[in-house]
């Protein structure tokens, strides 16, 4: 009778140590279809397929494709950004938000890659969702799918990573901020937020999301002299790159790549310590609705040193683009109209006579048909109130001018901006860019 527990214990031990059959699989999954009308910007959200497997994700990427699986070029529909969120996990850098963001990409074509031995733990019954932004640069409506590839390792244990989405502008509801453009060419706009680490461990991978005008995105460690431990530098396309030749221009083109940092050894961080995340943008010109978000992947390790040892020698940066420009190019966003032949053309000003006023505040009727008056001259210090008079969503966005003007999207209501710097301001609604554009001349 005494032998039985021993025998059962031996059997249990053998089962526990028996190696499972390890396998690596690359899955191709899709979300959609998503219908995008001509020159439309949409923000789709959807429940998406997970891997259907128990294992560890080691690689992931995403792109827009058509029904036959062919890549959709950005001169048709642009994937501005997408974030995949794991509803089964409950860590979020911003309290109160549901789920854990674990992969994101956009114009920079970021690809998730983890060092050997590390993976993001996933289960076959986990629930995933996506939030995204697509921008049409074509007159014709198009149906697109978000296709994503996931490499998953099953049948063996790996070191799990905790994804952390850390923004330079903190946990505001709106993940973007504006750079006003009131500096000289040598000045930078620095936006920094300190984030407290929830675990002790090692940063083994880090990516980043930036917009046009960005110089840098970095994470520094104050307890070690504020040294830089993560750098997600941008890489911009050559002047001939397609990103600079799509019309209408709905926003300032962003980087075509950002540096993805890897280290199998990992950079030690301690639970409770602060890390500073800084977005570094050009300050000499306005840049609207910019983002600076670093994506950290932290492996828990209670043995991670508490000192300030030299950074690991195996830190390296990989790029999805081999070549490009490191400094942000100057880009002027034109206002555009649809010609009589059905082509998108850049114009200096919309149709209509100048309306000259000395009033302290001018109300502009704003609807799908356009801004009225479309050409307005006001004195320095005066305000303009755009009154949105139809049921559609609209906004006011600077195309070019001395200072930034960037409203939220409105369904009705109004938006007021006071002009305090003389000059010529070209504005448009990026949701309806071919009909809703305006020139405001501010007189000294």
Language model features: what each stretch is:
Residues 8-16:
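Bacterial N-terminal signal peptides
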Residues 341-444:
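Extracytoplasmic copper-binding redox domains, predominantly the cupredoxin/blue-copper superfamily
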Residues 23-202, 207-342:
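Beta-strand-centric surfaces of beta-sandwich/beta-rich domains
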Residues 18-22:
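Sec/Tat signal peptide C-region and signal peptidase I cleavage site
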Residues 1-7:
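Bacterial N-terminal signal peptides that target proteins for export
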């Amino acid at each position: 009778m005494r032998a039985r527990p021993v025998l059962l214990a031996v059997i249990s031990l053998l089962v526990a140590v028996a190696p499972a059959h390890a396998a690596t699989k690359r899955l191709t999954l899709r979300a959609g279809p998503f219908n995008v009308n001509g020159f439309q910007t949409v923000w789709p959200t959807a429940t998406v397929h997970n891997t259907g497997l128990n294992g560890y994700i080691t690689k992931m990427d995403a792109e827009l494709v058509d029904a036959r699986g062919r890549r959709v070029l950005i001169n048709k529909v642009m994937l501005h950004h997408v974030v995949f969120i794991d509803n089964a996990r409950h860590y979020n850098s911003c309290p109160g938000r549901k789920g854990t963001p674990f992969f994101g990409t956009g114009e920079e074509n970021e690809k998730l890659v983890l060092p050997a031995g590390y993976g993001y733990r996933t289960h076959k019954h986990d629930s995933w969702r996506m939030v995204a932004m697509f921008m049409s640069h074509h007159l014709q409506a198009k149906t697109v799918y978000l296709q994503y590839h996931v490499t998953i390792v099953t049948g063996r244990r790996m070191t799990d990573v905790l994804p952390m989405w850390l923004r330079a502008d903190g946990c505001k509801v709106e993940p973007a901020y504006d750079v006003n453009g009131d500096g000289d060419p040598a000045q930078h706009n620095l936006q920094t937020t300190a984030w407290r680490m929830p675990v002790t461990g090692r940063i083994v991978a880090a990516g980043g999301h930036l917009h046009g005008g960005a110089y840098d995105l970095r994470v520094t460690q104050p307890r070690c002299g504020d040294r830089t431990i993560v750098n997600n530098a941008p890489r911009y396309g050559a002047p001939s790159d397609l990103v600079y030749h799509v019309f209408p221009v709905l926003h300032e083109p962003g980087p075509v790549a950002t540096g993805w940092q890897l280290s199998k050894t990992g950079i030690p961080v301690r639970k409770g310590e602060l890390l500073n995340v800084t977005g570094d943008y050009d300050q000499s010109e306005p840049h609207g609705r910019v983002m600076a978000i670093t994506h950290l992947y932290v492996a828990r390790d209670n043995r991670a040193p508490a000192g300030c040892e030299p950074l690991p020698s195996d830190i390296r940066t990989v790029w999805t683009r081999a070549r490009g420009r490191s400094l942000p190019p100057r880009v002027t966003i034109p206002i555009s109209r649809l010609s009589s032949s059905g082509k998108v053309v850049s114009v200096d000003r919309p149709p209509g006579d100048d309306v000259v006023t000395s009033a302290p505040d001018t109300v502009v009727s704003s609807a799908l048909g356009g801004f009225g008056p479309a050409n307005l001259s006001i004195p320095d210090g005066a305000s303009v109130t755009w009154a949105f008079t139809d049921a559609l969503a609209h906004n006011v966005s600077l195309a070019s001018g001395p200072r930034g003007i960037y409203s939220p999207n409105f369904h009705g209501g109004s938006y007021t901006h006071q002009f305090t710097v003389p000059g010529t301001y070209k504005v448009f609604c990026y949701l309806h860019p071919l009909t809703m554009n305006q020139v405001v001349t501010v007189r000294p």
